[in-house]
Amino acid sequence: MARYETVIGVEVHAQLKTKSKIFCSCSTRFGVDPNENVCPVCSGMPGVLPVLNATVVEYAAKMGLATGCVVNPVSVFARKNYFYPDLPKGYQTSQFEQPICEHGHVDITVDGTAKRIGITRIHMEEDAGKNIHSAADNLSYVDLNRACVPLIEIVSEPDMRGPEEVVAYLKALRAILVYLDVCDGNMEEGSFRCDANVSLRPVGQAEFGTRAELKNLNSFRHVQKAIEYEVERQADILDDGGKVIQETRLYDAAKNTTASMRGKEEAHDYRYFPDPDLVPVRIEAATLDKWRAELPELPEARRARFVADFGLSDYDAEVLTAERDMAEYFEAAVAAGADPKKAANWMQSELLRELNQAGVAARDAKLTPEKLASLVKLIDSGEISGKIAKQIFPDLFAQGLDPADYVRQKGLSQISDSNALESAVEAVLAANPAEVEAFRGGKTKLMGFFVGQIMKATKGQANPGLVNELLQKKLG
């Protein structure tokens, strides 16, 4: 593979979190009955006129500002003409020659190496409907609930050189969208979708190779696997002296392969032209300044602050800031008195596992940040051991219980009375004379065995530090 350089550009479609569609007042709510959120405008009836949702312009511009784009004071909608059953008007309202945003970037880090990925453009457009194919009656149905739902398409420069960079770019882009609260980033529901354009060229060659566009990439893992397969496929063709065909290929996750969907000769000539039903979008400088002032702290800035202010590692800061609600949960826990590094460890282990199993976001967890802070402080004070804390965490999480009250009610406080523990230590040593003799003979690793037996005898409530101290004294 060292003979070839991989070149990848990505197109992302992000559904915006508006309450109504881009050109009509129909709801954008997901999961309703087919064709429930439909009107004459989004079903393409003749004689109707679109009315632009102003919030779409605001959200698109804010994404442009957050990614360092030039936000154009004037942008124009265009008709993208093609025929498909889920496109009732026979064209998609999009932007072409004059998009709302251009010339931005996103910074990524892969294996400790920082890189800047260019963004060619961000433009507004409407989503298409959805075709539903029924094998039972050999029919295809069209659901127009998604038709006219607002999208922004984010087109990158061909700056990525491998699947790891693509995944890092997509995660960074998704995080920005979620932090801005303009998109929920849900890949399973299709609100964050991407296509990847992949090509190879001999190392040292400036000219791009022939690209294949990969579709049906609905998870970060699928993106990684599809690109890996496609790179290998194209390399095999070139090694055999063949030529890569420009085409669109569909990723099959079950087989981990890509298959041809359509070739260059089948590619659409979309015949773009300005939409006569929509006036140019004009953004005043004062409005843009207002939107810029409303931008939240973005993931990269928050990550750097977590490292500087809380002493977290780059890795911990990256994990905690990947999701806005996790970052806010962490800050709330620290504000409630939790040690930052210990709170970070609990969040990345116990809390994250419970959140994933329950399928809930951190902001919806019954165990509040203040209660997590209380748990961390109970461990720090010696009231309970880390082992006990892990044992009770599922109950605390599921019921949103107060840790201090729960520990008191269950009698789980750590035993730190040296007299009480001394009896337990003597009992364990008396029950294991052979191990005591072996320890005194040099097998010091048996210390862990003795500690384990004492913890078992005290049901995990013995103070580990005091146990070690007493054992050292007794075995001295």
From Swiss-Prot:
GO terms for biological process, alphabetical: glutaminyl-tRNAGln biosynthesis via transamidation; translation
EC category name: ligase
Reaction(s) catalysed (UniProt annotation): L-glutamyl-tRNA(Gln) + L-glutamine + ATP + H2O = L-glutaminyl-tRNA(Gln) + L-glutamate + ADP + phosphate + H(+); L-aspartyl-tRNA(Asn) + L-glutamine + ATP + H2O = L-asparaginyl-tRNA(Asn) + L-glutamate + ADP + phosphate + 2 H(+)
Keywords, sorted A to Z: ATP-binding, Ligase, Nucleotide-binding, Protein biosynthesis
UniProt xrefs under SMART domains: GatB_Yqey
UniProt superkingdom: Bacteria
Entry-linked InterPro entries: Asn/Gln-tRNA_amidoTrfase_suB/E, Asn/Gln-tRNA_Trfase_suB/E_cat, Asn/Gln_amidotransferase, Asn/Gln_tRNA_amidoTrase-B-like, GatB, GatB_C_1, GatB_Yqey_C_2, Gln-tRNA_amidoTrfase_suB_CS
Record-listed E.C. numbers: 6.3.5.-
Record-linked Pfam families: GatB_N, GatB_Yqey
GO molecular function, one term: ATP binding
Family: Belongs to the GatB/GatE family. GatB subfamily.
Summary of subunit composition and partner proteins: Heterotrimer of A, B and C subunits.
Entry function: Allows the formation of correctly charged Asn-tRNA(Asn) or Gln-tRNA(Gln) through the transamidation of misacylated Asp-tRNA(Asn) or Glu-tRNA(Gln) in organisms which lack either or both of asparaginyl-tRNA or glutaminyl-tRNA synthetases. The reaction takes place in the presence of glutamine and ATP through an activated phospho-Asp-tRNA(Asn) or phospho-Glu-tRNA(Gln).
UniProt protein name: Aspartyl/glutamyl-tRNA(Asn/Gln) amidotransferase subunit B
Gene from which the chain derives: gatB
